[in-house]
Amino acid sequence: MKTRHRTARRLVLASIGLALASHGHFQASPSATYLDATRVTAAFAKGMPLVETGGYKIHASRREAPGVAEVHVQDTDIIYVLEGTATVVTGGDVVNGRTLEGTIDEIRGASIRGGTAQRLSKGDVFIVPNGVPHQFTEVQAPFLYYVVKATDGGRR
């Protein structure tokens, strides 16, 4: 089990590195970002973003219940589960999908028709490419997970 978690952590770190490298973030930058444990713990208590830049976002996500169907036109979600279990449905078609108010690249809907279900639990890594419908269902709270959102920036 320890090997599985170690492998999952390595995959998450490699994904973060690839996301940053693909957006030129290994060039000279003004400074590194440090987030202390107090800030991270507080973010998970509410479920909120930790870092948001033009090339990537890192969220401390918390789910207490199932969510709506979502499509991120530009963001690929790289998810690492810290605690709890949930089923995520991906693919298929969004039922009653609408563009989220104030955005042009975020779609929300009631559910997903014809998708594939995957059970997620502690230590799992799950990647949802941009443009792929996804919805969390059957959530056992609290479901805590990091999401690294690698932004496509419109390059397709």
What is each PLM-predicted segment?
Residues 5-8, 20-74, 156:
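A short, N-terminal "cap"/entry segment at the start of jelly-roll beta-barrel domains
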Residues 11-18:
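Sec-dependent N-terminal signal peptides
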Residues 60, 88-90, 145:
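Short hydrophobic/aromatic-rich beta-strand segments that constitute the beta-sheet cores
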Residues 70, 77-80, 117-118, 125-126:
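His/acidic/aromatic-lined binding-pocket segments of jelly-roll/cupin-type domains
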